[in-house]
Amino acid sequence: MSHFFITASGTEIGKTHVAAGMIRHWRAGDVPARALKPVASGYQPALSASSDAGILLRAMGSSMVNDEAVATICPWRFPDPISPDMAAARSGRRIPFDDLVAFCQAEIVGAAGPMLVEGVGGAMVPLDETHTVRDWIAALGIEVVLVAGGYLGTISHTLCAVEALRARGIAIAAVVINPMEPLPVPVERTRESLLRHLGATPPPVFIDDTPDWHAWLDEAARR
């Protein structure tokens, strides 16, 4: 069974959009996929239904999305829209790294189908004084789906994220480009450039919500 960590080349790139699309695609084919969003900054309880975790809950078929429901997949929620280590400190709290990893592992072990763990921000965002999202991924030992944008600068940002992940021996299952307006070049050109620069054995690079991406998801669900 395949489980994936959803991270990105930066913040506000579309991790939740891509993760929710993966969940909806699998569930439409009767694959019992689930997702976690364990850490969130910029979270407002009154807007729980439109939060990242709320969007994932709706993709999983939840009819009632409120703060209590969000807490089941997002235990560490902070109001300030800043780096999670800073958001936690500003709230007088911290993100206990071992507890974070244990929470995810318990959910993965109990999963009946594919489990997605959506990170926070980009791959190198700090979680506390010593840990980043990359450390979180490495501790879980699951493959990454790296979300990239179509904006100016995305090629450099994506290649840097790939290098950072590879430096820790983290397997990248796929790179998914989430087309973001305005697009400085056609998204297919971005895909071609990434493939040229990702090394001799590059991970597959897809454009979100395309037949090729959906076919890859179908194959991943059968592993």
UniProtKB/Swiss-Prot annotation:
Superkingdom per UniProt: Bacteria
Pathway assigned in UniProt: Cofactor biosynthesis; biotin biosynthesis; biotin from 7,8-diaminononanoate: step 1/2
Cofactor: Mg(2+)
Swiss-Prot/TrEMBL GO biological process terms: biotin biosynthetic process
Coiled-coil residue spans: none
One of the record's GO molecular function terms: ATP binding
Sequence positions that bind Mg(2+): 16, 52, 118
UniProt keyword Metal-binding, yes or no: yes
Family: Belongs to the dethiobiotin synthetase family.
Protein name: ATP-dependent dethiobiotin synthetase BioD
UniProt lineage: Bacteria, Pseudomonadati, Pseudomonadota, Alphaproteobacteria, Acetobacterales
